[in-house]
Every structure is written in C-alpha cells, then in structure tokens.
Amino acid sequence: MNENAGRSLAPQASEGLGTPRDYISLLKPRVMSLVIFTALVGLVRAPDHVHPVIAFTAILCIAVGAGAAGALNMWWDADIDAVMSRTQRRPIPAGRVTPREALAFGLTLAAFSVVVLGLLVNVLAGALLAFTIFFYVVVYTMWLKRSTPQNIVIGGLSGALPPMVAWAAASGSISLESVILVAIIFFWTPPHFWALSLYRADDYARAGVPMLPVTAGPDETRKQILLYTLFLVPLALSPVMLGEAGLAYGVVAGVTGLGMLLLAVNVYRRRTGPAAVTAAKKLFGFSILYLFLLFATLLAEALVRGM
C-alpha cells in the first residue's frame, strides 16, 4: 500500500455512523446502473435460455460486485476525493463513513458476490467477476490511476467486462459476440472520460491524477478523442456486419455513431474559451446516450427475437 492509502486510513473528522444512504453512495449507483444494464444485455443475448432465478441471481451478483469495487475504490482514493471539488462530498472525505468501515463493506460485498455467483450459477462467471473486481480495484485504482495517463484506457477493461460475465452466467462460455460487447465499451471509455477530463483538468491536476489533459495537454487529448472515436464507430457497427444484430441496430449505430463523430470533430476544432468547454461537455453527455442507445437496441432486438 502506498502513502496515500496510509493517509486514507488516518482518523477522520467524525466517527462514521453513516446512514444507509451513505453506504448506497459508496456503491456508486450511477456506475452500478450502467453495469446492470450492460450485463442484462449480455444475459439476454446469450444463446441459452436462462431460468429466471438464475438470471436474477447473476444480475444481482454482478451489481453487488460492481458496488463492492466502487466502495473499495472510494476507500483507496479518499485522499484524492478530499481534494477534488466534484468528490469532496463523498461519504469518506466528508467524514460520514470511516475508511475502515468502507473497506470492510467493500470486501464483504466482493466476497459475497463472487462466491454466490460461482456456487449458484457457474464457476466461469464467478471467476470473471472476481477478475473484474480485482482489475478495477488493484490494477486500475491502486496502480494505473496514479501512475499513467493511460489509466482510463487500460483500466477501462474492468468497466467493459460485465456483459461477458453475464453471458458466461447464461451460457457457461464466452463467444465472439460477448467479446464485441466488451470491445465496444472498452473503446467508448476513453472518449467519454477524456471529454470529462478536458473541462475538469484543474481538478485532476490539483489531486495529482495524471489524466491525459494534465500530462500531454488538451490538444493531444482532443486528438486522441477523435482517433478513438474513429475506431469506435465502425466497431459498433460490427455486430451487423457479422450477422449478430439486425437492421434496427444498424440504423441506430449508424446515426448515433455519426453524431459521436461530429461531436468529436467539434471537440478537436474548438480549442480555446467557452466554446471548447461546451464542446467537451456536449460530447461527454452524448456519449452516455450513445452507449445507452446501442445496448438498448441490442436488448430490444434480442427480446423481439425471443418472442
């Protein structure tokens, strides 16, 4: 453990005694909702029929595992969260939950989610969930986040894996389509978070987090956003080309992909002043809608096909 973690375990301003709402906040509900949604798509699109109880158990365990990873991330990053304006009110830096309480909470949920998924669903799904939690907490949070501007690129794998975990829960195997679902989220992550970091660069710099705009500058970040978007858009169309998705998905992926590309070009061109901030915010917001529409269409096609 590094010195930052040592500080994060120091006595806090209060004795903890957090409310249920504080512990829910530790789970990062917004992130958890995305994990649940993308995992549900993986579960429904898997070729095997899944008993409703098994399906519910799988989604529950994946959600709890994601929440556990979020809690452990907040435990480790308490010193960073105390410095950054957008995270200062989180339960640990605000003193409502102590670091030790958050650590115990996160470890308990992580163990529960992996063991239950492995025993009640299948070992492959449990192993993939364990790897996902490990990658997010140890590889990304404890190592990459503070050491390299590629933190989001490499660390993004953990956020991309839930559809594969759910696919494995449903089928007991991994297929090409599950890999494509992971790849779409993986290559979506850098443009999404770099757009955010363009207008939050001062916050990251103050906390000592080497996000790309801090280390390489905003112009290089804009170029990387455009390059990743140029790769992401055709990748998102690949399920149609491979016969895994239908016309509806192709139309949605094509139209929204064009929107992503135009907004990325706008970010690349708008380099100074309020226009640059507005362009980055628009891309950040639209990227969320983009991913949602892609996966919602895949989900809808699978449900219609199963009728």
Swiss-Prot record:
It comes from the Bacteria. It is a multi-pass membrane protein. Belongs to the UbiA prenyltransferase family. Protoheme IX farnesyltransferase subfamily. Pathway: Porphyrin-containing compound metabolism; heme O biosynthesis; heme O from protoheme: step 1/1. One of its GO terms (cellular component) is plasma membrane. Its EC number is 2.5.1.141. The gene is ctaB. This is Protoheme IX farnesyltransferase. GO terms for molecular function: protoheme IX farnesyltransferase activity. It holds the Pfam family UbiA. It is found in: Cell inner membrane. InterPro entries: Protohaem_IX_farnesylTrfase, UbiA_prenyltransferase, UbiA_prenylTrfase_CS, UbiA_sf. It comes from Azorhizobium caulinodans (strain ATCC 43989 / DSM 5975 / JCM 20966 / LMG 6465 / NBRC 14845 / NCIMB 13405 / ORS 571). CDD domains: PT_UbiA_Cox10.
